[in-house]
Swiss-Prot record:
Family annotation (PROSITE patterns): PUR_PYR_PR_TRANSFER (PS00103)
Subunit structure: Homodimer.
Cofactor(s), by name: Mg(2+)
A Pfam family that the UniProt record links to this protein: Pribosyltran
UniProt KW Secreted keyword: no
This protein's name: Orotate phosphoribosyltransferase
Pathway connected to this protein: Pyrimidine metabolism; UMP biosynthesis via de novo pathway; UMP from orotate: step 1/2
InterPro entries recorded: OPRT (IPR023031), Or_phspho_trans_dom (IPR004467), PRibTrfase_dom (IPR000836), PRTase-like (IPR029057)
Function: Catalyzes the transfer of a ribosyl phosphate group from 5-phosphoribose 1-diphosphate to orotate, leading to the formation of orotidine monophosphate (OMP).
Organism taxonomic ancestry: Bacteria, Bacillati, Bacillota, Bacilli, Bacillales
Organism: Bacillus cytotoxicus (strain DSM 22905 / CIP 110041 / 391-98 / NVH 391-98)
PANTHER family hit by this protein: OROTATE PHOSPHORIBOSYLTRANSFERASE, URIDINE 5'-MONOPHOSPHATE SYNTHASE
Gene Ontology annotations of biological process type: 'de novo' UMP biosynthetic process; pyrimidine nucleobase biosynthetic process
Length: 210
């Protein structure tokens, strides 16, 4: 599963690896990887594989789920496809409440006491997913956990999720994707070394000259 999803993401260009020409994230951090899972929406076979995989993760880890919640905006489409496959209610959660109308942060129904699983496209530092979890908890829901398409496996993200006391499972991850990229000849040994060094300590830019 992890290798299959990693291959899909690389093949459609949803994930770029540029260890010799780093990306700059909005936080200002230099990174050898950039992930745009929104591209998966344009590839029916890929998005179907993702929906099936997310359904499998949910059934395995959170079998008592009653509602599927997507993170706005990237998680919404995947949450919709998964909820349709599982014949479950769906909602989505904004990063903050609307400034007009009813001022909703949660769109759709997620009622007090209901068991909810959050669908996210990407786990980086875990911030957006945790915002979603907190909003659902404030509404009285029992959040069983998070499922996502991909995770960078950053320690900062793992620590935040642990602090929020929420379980998280991803279809694929950084370690698997870089391995698949090397197997496909997309990166060489020197580039792999840089990718591995970044993974150990993303804040330390020494990996750029590794």
């Amino acid at each position: 599963m992890k290798k299959e999803i990693a291959s899909h993401l690389l093949e459609i260009g949803a994930v770029f690896l540029q260890p010799n020409d780093p990306f700059t994230w909005s936080s200002g951090m230099k990174s050898p990887i950039y992930c745009d899972n929104r591209l998966t929406l344009s590839y029916p076979k890929v998005r179907q594989a993702i929906a099936a995989g997310l359904e499998e993760l949910i059934k395995e880890h959170f079998p008592t789920v009653e509602v599927i919640a997507g993170t706005a905006t990237a998680g919404i489409a995947h949450a919709a496809w998964v909820s349709d496959r599982m014949n479950l209610p769906m909602c989505y959660v904004r990063s903050k409440a609307k400034g007009h109308g009813k001022g909703n942060q949660i769109e759709g129904k997620a009622e007090k006491g209901q068991k909810v699983v959050v669908v996210e496209d990407l786990i980086s530092t875990g911030g957006s997913a945790i915002t979603c979890v907190e909003a659902l908890r404030e509404a009285g829901c029992e959040v069983l956990g998070i499922v996502s398409i991909f995770t960078y496996e950053l320690e900062a993200g793992k620590e935040k999720l642990a602090a929020a006391n929420v379980a998280s499972y991803s279809l694929s991850d950084y370690s698997t994707l870089t391995q698949v990229a090397e197997e496909k000849g997309m990166i060489g040994q020197a580039e792999m070394k840089k990718l591995q060094e970044w993974r150990k300590n993303p804040a330390d830019e020494a990996w750029i000259t590794a």
